[in-house]
Amino acid sequence: MNKWHINKWYFFVGMLVIFAVIISLILKDTSLTFSSYDREKFPHLIGNSMVKKPSLAGRLKIIEIDGRKTLGDQHGNPIQLRGMSTHGLQWFPQIINNNAFSALSKDWEANVIRLAMYVGEGGYSTDPSVKEKVIEGINLAIKNDMYVIVDWHILNPGDPNAKIYSGAKEFFKEIASKYPNDLHIIYELANEPNPTESDITNDIAGWEKVKKYAEPIIKMLRDMGNENIIIVGNPEWSTRPDLAVNDPIDDKNVMYSAHFYTGSASVWENGNKGHIARNIEKALENGLTVFVTEWGTSEASGDGGPYLNEADEWLEFLNSNNISWVNWSLANKNEASAAFLPTTSLDPGNGKVWAVNQLSLSGEYVRARIKGIPYKPISRETMGK
């Protein structure tokens, strides 16, 4: 072999080595993005062993572990609920079908679904038939081994004592009579108390008005023999569970809701805990239990984003504190927080599940986070071409 061939051979080997190094670095970066990123920076995003189904966990109750109260199962062990919320059932009733609930339970591995029954905006107050969708949804949740949150969705006006919401007690009485002490059901009494067209102020006085509304309903449910978990909203669109610290509701199975949207509120703000995360921590540190019954990957409007890095920070915070959560929303609306693309049917088909490319960016992300698997987004560059 002459000198020219030797040099050519060394050049060829050298290029192979360089190529191998480049490939290994690419693979390493991919691993960091899809696996080590989740496990090292956010260790509580991977795994869902605490996300137990009703058939295993049974009746829910508040328990105390190491001096802090949290949600527990019938055996006294901690449990976390993860799942999805419907959008307004007056707008997206098509999601109430067995194929959808089956896909959420089996493919997404959700153990809870929230049925958002708006009262205003074309909801229950003007169209009582929307209640039938709630009943149908409860039946499907039970059939598909999920807990179900019955959400009295107040929003506009923001005072749960307003005349438009006067049917609340009778509504919950009817549901409780139809499903007496059913272990699957969680009652959410007031979605988001707020100052819109109301005097629900962002302070103790505002909380007292919410409490005044909630207590008679809670007493009625307990007098009927229902031991179910009951969730109560709080001022400023359910971002102030801390306001109940000095005057909590006297009931052993009451939880306080917290809502946030990752494009509008961060866990960390200027190196310190953000205001909503801080409010949640204060509630927990003072003996209350918190359930995030609504959060979105978008801005608070439901659109913009999705803000997935911020979502990772939030879910790490929630999972590490065993706080249950429900994502907004099961809709094919053209907005960032919707779980499905506008072209996707809310019925995946008999015996079928939604393909990942039928999900929005938010839906794809949240599905992975409910399942507790690494988030590996598909390429969307060629979709629709």
UniProtKB/Swiss-Prot annotation:
GO molecular function: cellulase activity
Keywords: Carbohydrate metabolism, Cell membrane, Cellulose degradation, Glycosidase, Hydrolase, Membrane, Polysaccharide degradation, Transmembrane, Transmembrane helix
Membrane-spanning ranges: 6-26
Pfam families tied to this protein: Cellulase
Reactions this protein catalyses: Endohydrolysis of (1->4)-beta-D-glucosidic linkages in cellulose, lichenin and cereal beta-D-glucans
Regulation of protein activity: Activity is enhanced by 1mM Mn(2+), but is not affected by 1mM Ca(2+), Mg(2+), Zn(2+), K(+), Na(+) or Li(+). Activity is not inhibited by EDTA (in vitro).
Oligomeric form and interacting partners: Monomer.
GO cellular component labels: plasma membrane
Coiled coil feature spans: none
Biotechnology: Thermostable endoglucanase that retains activity in the presence of high salt concentrations, suggesting it might be used as an industrial enzyme for cellulose-based substrates.
Gene3D superfamilies to which the protein is assigned, alphabetical: Glycosidases (3.20.20.80)
Name used for this protein in its record: Cellulase CelDZ1
Keyword Cell membrane carried by entry: yes
EC nos: 3.2.1.4
Residues bound to substrate: 87, 91-92, 118, 153, 261, 300-301, 328, 333-335
Annotated family: Belongs to the glycosyl hydrolase 5 (cellulase A) family.
Thermoactivity: Optimum temperature is 70 degrees Celsius. Retains about 85% activity after 24 hours at 65 degrees Celsius. Retains at least 50% activity after 4 hours at 70 degrees Celsius. Rapidly looses activity at 75 degrees Celsius.
